[in-house]
């Protein structure tokens, strides 16, 4: 049995370290409160694999994990070892044996798109973290398991600005806001299409990997049934093409075998009073209980979001945390 969870750390950085233009660095007191709070949430999750979003400093991530009191054999945030530049990175804490960790930054040439007024968009804004792990559970010792940690481009309008962060267009003009939102949509769509290729390369039984189990964790910045999420998962294609099952991803919430534990409505973020499930866990066919290729199942999915209704200090995450329990078969 393994627990998996995505965790938005909400700009986890060392004290005194500037991250976004116009936002003050954390002082020592605020940083300490952030470590204590995040460590406490990790302790509650007690997940075997945690995929982190918004990590500026690997040292801060390791400090937060240490505050949890839990033991992980690997804690890493590739690209943030000495501090991320320009945009936060993704991180991983795992108790499973790590075979390799890599970051996926660039799109294939055919996956690049032109974004109005910005030019060619050719790489993930936050490079994807890909890890190949080994579990001592499962049909055989050392069962391979891939994990993708993602953080797609947000729906926030992409306004034009200069290098100093000064606005270059009227943000009060509705037409300009619509065009800025289009830029964000194109960027997120391009990331989704590029990520789809990665998913297929891992899961296809006709591919180079021979089809290996995959768990995708992260902030999709849209709902599970949105166009961009389905570009990555292609779950809906299974309804009319059974041959698509091996390269589809399945929302853990939908394939959980203990549906009685579900709440009426799951959400991990509240924006302007509107709840959304942005933080998601997707699994390959190997974790769908009814599949003849199943090596396990999703037993249950839980959401930890009570803090979203508490005070809004920035040392808390503005996202809820989701945890899925994956049960691997033995023998």
Predicted stretch roles:
Residues 49-51, 55-157:
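Structured beta-strand-rich core segments of catalytic domains in phosphoester-bond hydrolases
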Residues 58, 99-103, 117, 122-124, ...:
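Metal-dependent phosphoester-hydrolase catalytic domains
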Residues 127, 176-180, 263-265:
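Flexible glycine/proline-enriched surface loops and loop-helix/loop-strand junctions
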Residues 30-37, 123-125, 183-194:
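Soluble or luminal CAZymes and related metallo-dependent hydrolases
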Residues 4-9, 156-159, 290-291:
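Short, solvent-exposed loop/turn elements at domain surfaces
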Residues 2, 55-56, 153, 220-223:
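Catalytic metal-binding/acid-base residues of hydrolase active sites
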Residues 1-71, 76-90, 168-173, 193, ...:
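N-terminal, active-site-proximal structural segment of metallo-dependent hydrolase catalytic domains
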Residues 136-148, 152-193, 197:
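Metal-dependent phosphoester/phosphodiester hydrolase catalytic core
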């Amino acid at each position: 049995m393994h627990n998996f969870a995505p965790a938005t750390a909400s700009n986890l950085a060392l004290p005194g370290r500037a991250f976004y233009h116009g936002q003050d660095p954390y002082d020592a007191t605020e940083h300490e409160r952030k470590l204590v709070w995040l460590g406490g949430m990790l302790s509650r999750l007690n997940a075997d694999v945690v995929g982190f979003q918004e990590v500026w400093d690997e040292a801060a991530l390791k400090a937060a994990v240490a505050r949890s009191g839990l033991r992980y054999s690997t804690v890493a945030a590739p690209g943030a070892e000495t501090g991320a530049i320009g945009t936060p990175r993704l991180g991983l804490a795992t108790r499973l044996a790590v075979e390799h960790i890599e970051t996926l930054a660039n799109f294939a040439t055919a996956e690049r798109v032109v974004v109005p007024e910005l030019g060619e968009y050719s790489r993930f804004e936050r490079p994807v973290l890909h890890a190949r792990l080994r579990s001592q559970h499962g049909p055989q010792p050392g069962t391979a398991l891939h994990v993708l940690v993602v953080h797609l481009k947000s729906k926030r309008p992409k306004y034009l600005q200069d290098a100093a962060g000064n606005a270059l267009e009227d943000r009060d003009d509705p037409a300009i806001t619509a065009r800025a939102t289009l830029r964000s949509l194109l960027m997120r769509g391009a990331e989704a299409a590029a990520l789809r290729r990665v998913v297929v390369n891992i899961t296809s039984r006709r591919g180079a990997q021979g089809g290996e189990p995959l768990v995708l964790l992260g902030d999709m910045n849209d709902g599970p049934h949105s166009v961009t999420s389905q570009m990555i998962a292609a779950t809906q294609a299974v309804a009319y093409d059974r041959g698509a099952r091996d390269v589809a991803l399945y929302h853990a919430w939908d394939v959980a075998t203990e549906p009685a534990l579900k709440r009426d409505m799951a959400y991990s973020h509240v924006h302007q009073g509107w709840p959304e499930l942005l933080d998601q866990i997707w699994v390959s066919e190997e974790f769908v209980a009814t599949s003849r290729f199943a090596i396990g199942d999703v037993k249950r999915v839980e959401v930890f979001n009570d803090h979203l209704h508490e005070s809004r200090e920035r040392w808390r995450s503005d996202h809820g945390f989701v945890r899925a329990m994956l049960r691997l078969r033995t023998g």
